[in-house]
Amino acid sequence: MPHTVATPPPLLQVRGISKQFSGVVVLKSIDFTLQPGQVHALLGGNGAGKSTLMKIIAGILPPDTGVIEMNGQPCFNLTPAKAHQLGIYLVPQEPMLFANLSVQENILFRLPKHQADKKKMAQLLKNLGCHLDLSVSAGSLEVADQQLVEIMRGLIRDSHILILDEPTASLTPAETHRLFSQIRMLLQQGVGVVFISHKLPEIRQLADWVSVMRDGGIALSGATADFSTEDMIQAMTPEAQKGALTDSQKLWLELPGNRRAQSHAQSQQPVIHVHDLSGEGFAHISFHVQAGEILGLAGVVGAGRTELAETLYGLRPASTGNVILEEVNITAMKTANRLAAGLVYLPEDRQASGLYLDAPLSWNVCALAHDRQGLWTQPAQEAAVLERYRRALNIKFSHLEQPVRTLSGGNQQKLLIAKCLEANPLLLIIDEPTRGVDVSARSDIYQLIRSIAEQQVAIIFISSDLEEVVQMADRVLVMHQGEINGALSGAAMNVDTIMHMAFGEHRSASEPQGGTASSAENKGASC
């Protein structure tokens, strides 16, 4: 009688998982399987239920119904600590580090002594190609480096199931390549990876299997090679998205008391003129931005883009140089005065710096309002403002008093944009506006930014996604090691050229608006 070889059980099997919050169903009888050595990609629009499902698997939330099995054994009453013991580790979309602890302390936090192997940690860093200083405080790191620390926390715990929630959102192409190499090494050791991402090319490159969630259920699941990109997009967004904001949306989006309607609206002077500005992380920066122009700011992590943006907004001091906003020197102004003058900053980390997560939506959207006297104490006015942006930006929420942290990532980002617009900007600095948002929400945000520019607001657009920089910007400045390495426009503005310049290569470029093509030419000159 022939012997049959028993098929080993999946590393992880989820069956019939359901969940609701305050009567709203967010997961509908979900089935999900992860095999050893497999990358299972999870796609879905913001609010589809991806993060809720992963939090249940990681023991952060309890399911209402359903079963979770590891290696064929049911797991009951999961907690984060129990999930870690079982080898499940969730790397969150937004880094959740202890800002005042060192990088090393964060990686080893609450790790049993027999696992707290510093040599192993050093080897993992080497394998990842990281050059992190383990002694510095985690709060001093760029968002991309904070993300790598989170990943390290999972790797050093010998996780068998690694859940990566948008791990490459703030990584450069080189960092993404190193991360993927490390993931492939883990796969050879039998580790299973759940890979949540909105970057479809990455999913095709890395994932064996893909599942698409929509409205709390699984809309598509199977081998990645069996589905086209269009199949995945249609599964996420069943109704075709229009290419631009509707006339109704544009009407609701009209800025309150638009400063461009005032006497200086027809001025040919730049909205902002930065001359020979230096500060922590950058030096000798000069450029200008006209009304209605979208100026892209590209570069790898550590190039100084965010430091420059924070200095323009007054969060960091400038050591030399001048910043002129509408012919007024604001270099020595405090942040509040710059905001009142019309300079508004949308930060890259919406949860840490942009929104009050436990405050109501209606209060958040009015928090930066230029004239707030009595506004935040008048619920009717707050409600009217929020309703206007709900219609304009298609923000999805249940009620006005809903805490911000309960929104999906894409809706949080839209709310942050609404908060900035309510401040009535002359210049809007947008740092990583699509980090962690889905394909549909990205399209909404792109059209929104263009509509803002059409109202003659000047925009500085900072992004690590070079394709969206090329897609969105009228001109691009490329930063390398704190200086402008070149300025591009027109046909010269392409991903390949920007990439080479971001890594320090000098390339000639046509810049009809007075921009420069090298940092040497840029010093003291205006682009």
Swiss-Prot record:
GO MF entries: ATP binding; ATP hydrolysis activity
Gene3D superfamilies (UniProt xref): P-loop containing nucleotide triphosphate hydrolases
Residue positions binding ATP: G44, G45, N46, G47, A48, G49, K50, S51
SMART domains, per database record: AAA
Topological category with respect to the lipid bilayer: Peripheral membrane protein
EC number of the protein: 7.6.2.13
Short name of any one Pfam family annotated for the protein: ABC_tran
The name this protein goes by in its record: Autoinducer 2 import ATP-binding protein LsrA
Naturally occurring in which organism (per UniProt): Yersinia pestis
Gene name linked to the record: lsrA
